[in-house]
């Protein structure tokens, strides 16, 4: 989930399939569709021409069947086909593979390290499943998101696609713990950098001049893929996006086993702050947001739990090293403002604290809500819309009580100064024993 904090236009509905014609069209590869594709043959009892007189045997025209088209399944738009049916052998695409360099170069060919890596087949299959879901959903979303849509339409369109492709609608108790959405979809506009998703009743509409960070996660059995991108329709922001994308790729390149966090942060800051952006005749240096970090990812724990590590995006600080077997979200944030974020606006993101104290709860609403959270989300982050979707109502008092008792954490939106613009790009990387895998890498970013 995004960041870890250091200290008149027609709507394009992401949930639609292009109108009634598309809705009634038979699915590719369906029996109905295949029957239509094998047309052009005569019925034995109809339309067969006679030769000779009436006593002669009737000759029937030979059937000429068209060859059936090879209809391998492809993903729909919007994405709605469960991914396991597109990859029936559970062989999901691997991410970008990068061999270790310098003193770790031996890992690529070392037989012991290769053996350790082969022991991680289930781990890798689950991560690659989640990563391919993320790629397919985001690549459609990048085409479909347009000015004039509400933030609720955008967020829910992405979430419905994730639920469909993982095969986990999340409405039955425990279903979302097996797979699906890893944390609320962030749709963060302009000076808001992270942790914003619409609550019920939100009417905010995406405008042409907005810069929107889209941050969403997918998990399979708690293996979380966390990746984010930024959308801007006005080319005036191109340099801002380029700066942050460059910084993220620099961080990914630097990351590896035994690499110090401080060295990664210094490289990220140098790359990002070599850019500037001109807006309405004024040049702004792109600043790394110094109190936002990348982070380790644990199973069912987006920020790595109590032993989690942070990946800074500015120089100085932590001398901790990355280690073999760790999973990281490498994310960077750039801003035309101060390069520092604060809590602002209405909270929507929450998560149960993994090692929360066993506090006696006096409010029955808090007890009941904690039971719902535990059985449906565990320690995965959730938002108010997800509670609404499960049929919960009048839960705010109980939710605030859980926060006050240190059982649930609240994650308010994180914002720079109003009038500034922020951008974000993020990937999940696996530090495998013999190679580094950028698991969420795609053709888009």
UniProtKB/Swiss-Prot annotation:
Source species: Paracoccidioides lutzii (strain ATCC MYA-826 / Pb01) (Paracoccidioides brasiliensis)
HAMAP family xref list: MetAP_2_euk (MF_03175)
Molecular function in Gene Ontology: initiator methionyl aminopeptidase activity; metal ion binding; metalloaminopeptidase activity
Cofactor note: Binds 2 divalent metal cations per subunit. Has a high-affinity and a low affinity metal-binding site. The true nature of the physiological cofactor is under debate. The enzyme is active with cobalt, zinc, manganese or divalent iron ions. Most likely, methionine aminopeptidases function as mononuclear Fe(2+)-metalloproteases under physiological conditions, and the catalytically relevant metal-binding site has been assigned to the histidine-containing high-affinity site.
Protein name: Methionine aminopeptidase 2
Reactions catalysed according to its record: Release of N-terminal amino acids, preferentially methionine, from peptides and arylamides
EC category: hydrolase
GO CC aspect terms: cytoplasm
Alphabetically ordered keywords of this record: Aminopeptidase, Cytoplasm, Hydrolase, Metal-binding, Protease
Family: Belongs to the peptidase M24A family. Methionine aminopeptidase eukaryotic type 2 subfamily.
């Amino acid at each position: 989930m995004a960041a870890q904090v250091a200290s008149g236009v027609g709507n394009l509905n992401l949930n639609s399939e292009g109108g009634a014609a598309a809705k009634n069209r038979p699915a590719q590869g369906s029996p109905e569709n295949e029957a239509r594709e094998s047309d052009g043959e005569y019925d034995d009892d109809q339309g067969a021409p006679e030769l000779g007189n009436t006593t002669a045997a009737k000759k029937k025209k030979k059937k000429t069947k068209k060859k059936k088209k090879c209809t391998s399944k492809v993903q729909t738009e919007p994405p709605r086909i469960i991914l396991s049916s597109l990859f029936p052998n559970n062989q999901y695409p691997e991410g970008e593979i990068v061999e270790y360099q310098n003193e770790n170069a031996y890992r690529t060919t070392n037989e012991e390290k290769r053996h350790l890596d082969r022991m991680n087949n289930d781990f890798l299959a689950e991560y690659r499943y989640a990563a391919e879901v993320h790629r397919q959903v985001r690549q459609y979303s990048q085409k479909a998101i347009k000015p004039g849509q509400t933030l609720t339409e955008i967020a829910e369109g992405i979430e419905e696609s994730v639920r469909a492709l993982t095969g986990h609608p999340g409405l039955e108790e425990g279903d979302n713990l097996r797979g699906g959405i890893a944390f609320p979809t962030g749709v963060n506009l302009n000076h808001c950098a992270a942790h914003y998703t619409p609550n019920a009743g939100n009417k905010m509409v995406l405008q042409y001049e907005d810069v929107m960070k889209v941050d969403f996660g997918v998990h399979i059995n708690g293996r979380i893929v966390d990746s984010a991108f930024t959308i801007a329709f006005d080319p005036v922001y191109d340099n801002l996006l380029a700066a942050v994308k460059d910084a993220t790729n620099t961080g990914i390149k630097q990351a590896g086993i035994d690499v110090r966090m401080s060295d990664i942060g210094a490289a990220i800051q140098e790359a990002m702050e070599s850019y500037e952006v001109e807006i309405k005749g004024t040049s702004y240096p792109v600043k790394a947001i110094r109190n936002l970090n990348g982070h380790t990812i644990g199973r069912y724990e987006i920020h790595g739990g109590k032993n989690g590590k942070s990946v800074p995006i500015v120089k100085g600080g932590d001398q901790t090293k990355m280690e073999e077997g760790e999973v990281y979200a490498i994310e960077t944030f750039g801003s035309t403002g101060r390069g520092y974020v604060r809590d602002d606006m209405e909270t929507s993101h929450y998560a149960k604290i993994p090692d929360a104290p066993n506090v006696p709860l006096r409010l029955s609403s808090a007890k009941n809500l904690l039971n719902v959270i535990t059985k449906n989300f565990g320690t995965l982050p959730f938002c108010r819309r997800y509670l609404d979707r499960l049929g919960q109502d009048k839960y705010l008092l109980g939710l605030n009580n859980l926060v006050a008792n240190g059982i649930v954490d609240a994650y308010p939106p994180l914002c720079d100064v109003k009038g500034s613009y922020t951008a974000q790009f993020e990937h999940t990387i696996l530090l495998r024993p013999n190679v580094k895998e950028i698991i969420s890498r795609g053709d888009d970013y």
